[in-house]
């Protein structure tokens, strides 16, 4: 304990004698809260400055970087706004009990022992260094002496290390975009002038030095006052499309005092006590929590044939926490956003489609007018099965069986398996290739699509063993599953080691779809007649060939009759 007073002297002295010229140490505004079991310290860096690092000195005067250390009772975290938040237990390795009379902790007079003073004369003290850089880029440390009174359990304090704020819990200042986007004529004052920028920012408001004005930004600004009131300012531009401010109200408030105390074209300001307007209260640990909720109506546009809206539900929950052992100072203020509503489900038609793409990129597809599609044997055919006219990302498509038939009837006895239980049929010497689908502009929901390619084939007459010329149709049976991407909505194909049975078992819970039209499959090789046709120098008419044959027969018969007549005369 006796080492603490010399320590307070040596820390600033070591900074002063480090160089010939003392650097200009930047001053970081900070907020200290003294709780029952610990102290909380928040550092707010200046705009454009890097997040500062915190160091601390132990009883021997050795510096340590502050970090999360449950053994030493320190916790450090960074808020989304860039502030550094320190929480240190009064039993921390770096917190000491300081006992003094009327002198400040910088004098050389030894402190009075704790046994000789009242609790009001003793404090918990923690020395924190805030590391930063000065204008010349040199590394400097700003020392903060955090002092909390060793109060009886029925007291709690909030004290400030910067000029006296207008409230006890410092809020994050809005970013520049939220401030600059408010036109001068729409600015709603947050505090009266004159006011410093630091005090204005602690209110969570915007500051303009040229007019010394403090005003609300295009967001929700909520505060808890010392006398037990909510102060909530809501900008119409907090949502897109903008809010209907004239419909904004407290969800459970019916009295006149629950209406906005000030409303403009761009802002609505609510100010009401905790014991009214349907505010709920409960106690958790040593804190009392007060909570209320704001709601707004949707902007509905109507014309003679119907109504539309582009708004979602707006609900804003605001909460304030106070120490149950104190009736003066708020501990924290929180604004909660309502989670998005659950997806609405209803019965309705579900459209499935089987299409054939013109190339492997699936950039275009054959339409009704393009059928029948003519393909040569062993040409690839790119097939796609998809869910149509749905936007639910939780839906998935399962492809069970796909097969081909020589006619429109999907139940034809003559058929060839393409996919069996969602996997390529291994009995084919040209196996079907499954094609993965990635998210893209034309496929925003990849789980809606299944793609595969097959090689063109021709059905063969079982008895005569010749290829059947005629149309070939494709068919698939599919099912819809939820949620997409889970094991119940995915088929894994094993490594094929033996010939798979080709029987297709159609599930009763699946739907069957077919291609929009047939395919005409042609032989890629030429027969003898085609070769003769190709090698001829001129086209050969079949009727001319018939006449030539008939003439030859007649000439041969005439010659034969003449030969027999001459022989008879002899």
Swiss-Prot record:
Keyword Metal-binding: no
Membrane topology: Single-pass type I membrane protein
Domain ZP: 223-496
Name of the coding gene: ZP4
Name used for this protein in its record: Zona pellucida sperm-binding protein 4
GO terms of biological process kind: binding of sperm to zona pellucida; prevention of polyspermy
Signal peptide: 1-19
Organism: Felis catus (Cat)
Location within or outside the cell: Cell membrane
């Amino acid at each position: 304990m006796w080492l603490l007073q010399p320590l307070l002297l040596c820390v600033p002295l070591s900074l002063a004698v480090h160089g010939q010229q003392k650097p200009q140490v930047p001053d970081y505004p900070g907020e200290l809260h003294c709780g029952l079991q610990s102290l909380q310290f928040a550092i707010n860096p200046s705009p454009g400055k890097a997040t500062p690092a915190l160091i601390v000195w132990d009883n021997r005067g050795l510096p340590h970087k502050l970090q999360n250390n449950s053994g030493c009772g320190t916790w450090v975290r960074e808020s989304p706004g860039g502030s550094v938040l320190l929480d240190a237990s009064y039993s921390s390795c770096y917190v000491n009990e300081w006992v003094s009379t009327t002198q400040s902790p910088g004098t050389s007079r030894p402190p009075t022992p704790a046994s000789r003073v009242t609790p009001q004369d003793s404090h918990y003290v923690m020395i924190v260094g805030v590391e930063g850089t000065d204008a010349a880029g040199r590394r400097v440390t700003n020392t903060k002496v955090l002092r909390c009174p060793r109060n009886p359990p029925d007291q709690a304090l909030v004290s400030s290390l910067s000029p006296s704020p207008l409230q006890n819990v410092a809020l994050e200042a809005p970013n520049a975009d939220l401030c600059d986007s408010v036109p001068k004529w729409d600015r709603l004052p947050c505090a009266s002038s004159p006011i410093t920028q630091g005090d204005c920012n602690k209110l969570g408001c915007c500051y303009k030095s040229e007019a010394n004005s403090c005003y609300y930004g295009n967001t929700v600004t909520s505060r808890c006052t010392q006398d037990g009131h909510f102060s909530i300012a809501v900008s119409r531009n907090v949502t897109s499309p903008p809010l209907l401010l004239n419909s904004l109200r407290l969800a459970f408030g019916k009295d006149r005092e629950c209406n906005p105390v000030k409303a403009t074209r761009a802002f609505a300001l609510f100010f009401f006590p905790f014991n009214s307007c349907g505010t709920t209260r409960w106690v958790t640990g040593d804190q009392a929590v007060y909570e209320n909720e704001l709601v707004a109506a949707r902007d509905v546009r109507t014309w003679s044939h119907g109504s539309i809206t582009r708004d979602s539900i707006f609900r804003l929950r605001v909460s304030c926490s106070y120490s149950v052992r104190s009736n003066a100072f708020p501990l924290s203020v929180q604004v909660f956003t309502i989670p998005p509503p659950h997806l609405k489900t209803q019965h309705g038609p579900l459209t499935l489609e089987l299409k054939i793409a013109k190339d492997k990129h699936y950039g275009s597809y054959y339409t009704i007018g393009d059928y029948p599609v003519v393909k040569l044997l062993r040409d690839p055919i790119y097939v796609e099965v998809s869910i149509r006219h749905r936007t639910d990302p939780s839906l998935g498509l399962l492809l069970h069986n796909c097969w081909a038939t020589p006619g429109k009837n999907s139940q034809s006895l003559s058929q060839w398996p393409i996919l069996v239980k969602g996997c390529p049929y291994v009995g084919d010497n040209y196996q079907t290739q499954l094609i993965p689908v990635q998210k893209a502009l034309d496929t925003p929901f990849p789980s809606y699509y299944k793609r595969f390619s097959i090689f063109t084939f021709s059905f063969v007459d079982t008895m005569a063993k010749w290829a059947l010329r005629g149309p070939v149709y494709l068919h698939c049976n599919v099912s819809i599953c939820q949620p997409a991407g889970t094991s119940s909505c995915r088929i894994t194909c094993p490594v094929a080691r033996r010939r798979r049975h080709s029987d297709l078992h159609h599930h009763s819970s699946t739907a069957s779809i077919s291609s929009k039209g047939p395919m005409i499959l042609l032989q890629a090789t030429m027969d003898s007649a085609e070769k003769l046709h190709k090698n001829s120098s001129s086209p050969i008419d079949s009727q001319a060939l018939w006449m030539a044959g008939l003439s030859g027969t007649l000439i041969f018969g005439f010659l034969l009759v003449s030969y027999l007549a001459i022989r008879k005369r002899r």
